[in-house]
């Protein structure tokens, strides 16, 4: 009888543990990442705040990132693929939160980052652009239409790939 009760308790503990682990990893689910980290970004339809590299008249992908950010570095291959596929139809601007120009230049050269880079070379939370665009997570991406309005925001490059495919369907 004791073995049966012990076995039942052990099974219950295993089920509860597995259930708890499942809910803890839900935040890791790509569908939920934007809910967690992109919720306070500029709203769709908002005029994109001006900065020297941003020009109206073309679609623009803004990629807020830093060389010291592991998630950003992991997304670079996806951003490179986007740039290669859509770089003639949209302008890509990397908005770097790096403080050292030489480190940024070395990283972009070593990793084949060919799109324009913009940086204030200040600490992330001290930059005007991060305040203007309400950046609280890196990486963060914005899609700006030719009229200068925000049309999409995400913290996942793979989601931006899907959005660009909707806007620029293959012929």
Where are these regions (language model features)?
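Thiol/disulfide oxidoreductase modules built on the thioredoxin-like
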Residues: 113, 121-167
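Conserved redox-active cysteine motifs that mediate thiol-disulfide chemistry
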Residues: 64-81
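Conserved hydrophobic packing residues within short motifs/helices of P-loop NTPase cores
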Residues: 62, 93-95, 142
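Extracytoplasmic/secreted envelope proteins and their assembly/folding machinery
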Residues: 76-80, 101-105, 130, 161-164
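Conserved segment of the thioredoxin-like fold in thiol-based oxidoreductases
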Residues: 82-125, 135-138
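Short pre-active-site segment immediately N-terminal to redox-active cysteine/selenocysteine motifs
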Residues: 58-60, 64-68, 137
